[in-house]
């Protein structure tokens, strides 16, 4: 199936690999600066997610928030983040990723300030919804711009740094939040964990305006100016010229609404705890997905540019890589959720001890990400298979440690060693799969493709957390004492292994179809 980008624009690469040029300006831009600006907001968003668990008790106390309020503090951000990814990715591809990145970061920063100033739980949740939209706006632009301005091994290294930032941010978030709350006290502390994003966000916007090439935006502006000049020349000569046509921007509003509603219907039942009519939304979501696919096909057949060109899925590397990511997130994101429940409720560990037990995992994950990034272009899919095997081994050995804790009373700190195996696998898989899944996607669709993949990950996270914690509490409820928590831990980790085995099958199939890496060096696009 032929794949034709709707819009094309060029960027040229100078002899210095760090420098790039774009049409419409004599300025030279540095990739290293672009990457710094792209990754800092990613860290901000992940710290906002990982630190909120530590802040919840103080939020509950100072705002007199109900359990439902607290649930939406957690889920509201994730929900609006998830439904924003694909529309924002498409808008960035069409209108320009640089400006959309800045706009999303500004929305995120202002919403963070509003969270910190919220006088009650209701306004806090509204601000969290907006914060999620902002993060969902700039996240796909990050992947799209890495896809646009880096190629081959350098792109793999950029995505490896992306993985390092992810691992570091997830680990630092709870520790940073705990330190801030302890330093400033309950009333000011949790608010400061939100407000701290505001100055960093404004700095990021300022640096983006200075350091981003804005290649697409310059190309669109140049085309408008050329059209106006040609129209003015024709008018000046006295010739009869047609009215200057308005620039046509096709964002496929119907397709956008259908997909947003479909993702909302799929994620909401799992985030709200299900029950009653909530599960009927899943059926509605299935119908909406079918309607969306039919609409996108019809829209393209009419010669229009659909929000997601379904030809994206004709790239085996993209469709298989997205399947690996979605099924991996289905299981892996619950690893530390279950650990926290088991340690604090079953073993009586403190929140600080629970946070610290994950630090070795984050450290080795960061190193594994950088190691994999240097080898992705030659051995990427073997790395993915090996990484999944390590995570499965780490999960299985964690169950063995839990059994030893129950039977012989060994220290729960032994879990940090088995979770390090999981960290090695998580870091290696993230760097390699991120690069290879987008390798064949045209750069003009980098944001859309990144948004689709991230949406699959968000859905996997929502479904997996609900399913696996349900298994955990289901087994805890039929027993008594510490043994019941151990049984729940083992059952939940067994469910995680099943999800990871599905991801492993998808990864093996991906290597069989696509080989171990790109068939040839990636061409300059």
Regions found by a protein language model. Name each.
Residues 69, 122-126, 187-196, 249, ...:
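Interfacial loop-to-helix junctions that mark the boundaries of transmembrane helices
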Residues 45, 74-77, 81, 132, ...:
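Structural signature of transmembrane alpha-helices in multi-pass secondary transporters
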Residues 182-183, 187-323, 331:
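Hydrophobic transmembrane-helix bundles of small-molecule transporters
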Residues 2-34, 194, 207-213, 248, ...:
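Transmembrane-helix exit segments and adjacent C-terminal regions of multi-pass membrane proteins
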Residues 31-54, 303-515:
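12-transmembrane solute porter fold
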Residues 107-117, 134, 200-207, 287-291, ...:
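Transmembrane-helix signature of multi-pass solute transporters
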Residues 58, 145, 149, 179, ...:
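A residue-level signal for alpha-helical anchor/packing sites in multi-pass solute transporters
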Residues 2-210, 470, 474, 497:
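Transmembrane-helix bundle of Major Facilitator Superfamily
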């Amino acid at each position: 199936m032929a794949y034709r980008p709707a819009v094309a624009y060029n960027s040229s690469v100078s002899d210095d690999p760090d420098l790039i040029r774009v049409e419409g300006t004599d300025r030279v831009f540095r990739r290293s600066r672009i990457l710094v600006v792209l990754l800092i907001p990613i860290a901000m968003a992940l710290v906002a997610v990982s630190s909120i668990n530590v802040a919840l008790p103080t939020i509950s106390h100072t705002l007199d928030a109900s359990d439902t309020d607290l649930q939406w503090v957690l889920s509201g951000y994730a929900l609006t983040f998830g439904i924003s990814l694909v529309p924002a990715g498409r808008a960035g591809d069409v209108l320009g990723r640089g400006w959309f990145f800045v706009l999303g970061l500004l929305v995120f920063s202002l919403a963070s300030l509003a969270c910190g100033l919220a006088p009650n739980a209701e306004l806090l949740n509204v601000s969290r919804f907006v914060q999620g939209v902002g993060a969902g706006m700039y996240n796909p632009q990050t992947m799209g711009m890495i896809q646009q301005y880096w190629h081959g091994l350098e792109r793999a290294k950029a995505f490896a740094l992306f993985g390092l930032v992810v691992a570091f941010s997830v680990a630092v978030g709870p520790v940073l939040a705990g330190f801030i709350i302890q330093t400033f006290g309950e009333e000011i502390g949790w608010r400061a964990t939100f407000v701290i994003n505001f100055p960093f966000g404004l700095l990021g916007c300022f640096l983006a305006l200075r350091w981003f090439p804005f290649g697409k935006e310059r190309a669109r502006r140049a085309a408008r100016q050329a059209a106006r000049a040609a129209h003015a020349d024709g008018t000046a000569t006295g010739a009869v010229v047609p009215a200057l046509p308005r620039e046509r921007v096709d964002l496929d509003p119907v397709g956008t609404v259908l997909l947003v509603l479909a993702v909302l219907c799929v994620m909401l039942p799992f985030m709200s705890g299900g029950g009653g009519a909530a599960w009927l939304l899943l059926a509605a979501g299935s119908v909406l997905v079918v309607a969306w696919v039919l609409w996108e096909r019809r829209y393209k057949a009419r010669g229009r540019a659909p929000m997601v060109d379904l030809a994206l899925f004709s790239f085996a590397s993209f469709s298989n890589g997205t399947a690996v990511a979605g099924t991996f997130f289905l299981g892996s994101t619950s690893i530390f959720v279950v650990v926290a429940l088991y340690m604090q409720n079953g073993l009586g560990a403190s929140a600080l001890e629970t946070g610290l037990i994950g630090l070795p995992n984050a450290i080795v994950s960061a190193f594994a990400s950088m190691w994999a990034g240097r080898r992705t272009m030659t051995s990427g899919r073997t790395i993915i298979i090996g990484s999944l095997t390590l995570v499965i081994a780490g999960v299985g050995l964690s169950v063995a440690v839990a059994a030893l804790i129950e039977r012989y009373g060994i220290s729960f700190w032994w879990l940090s060693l088995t979770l390090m195996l999981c960290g090695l696998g998580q870091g290696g898989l993230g760097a390699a799969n991120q690069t290879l899944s987008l390798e064949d996607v045209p750069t003009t669709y980098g944001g859309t493709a990144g948004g689709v993949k991230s949406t699959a990950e968000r859905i996997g996270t929502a479904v997996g957390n609900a399913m696996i914690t349900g298994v955990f509490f289901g087994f805890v409820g039929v027993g008594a004492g510490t043994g019941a928590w151990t049984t729940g831990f083992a059952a939940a980790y067994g469910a995680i292994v099943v999800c990871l085995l599905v991801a492993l099958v998808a990864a093996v199939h991906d290597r069989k179809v696509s080989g171990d890496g790109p068939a040839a060096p990636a061409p300059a696009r």
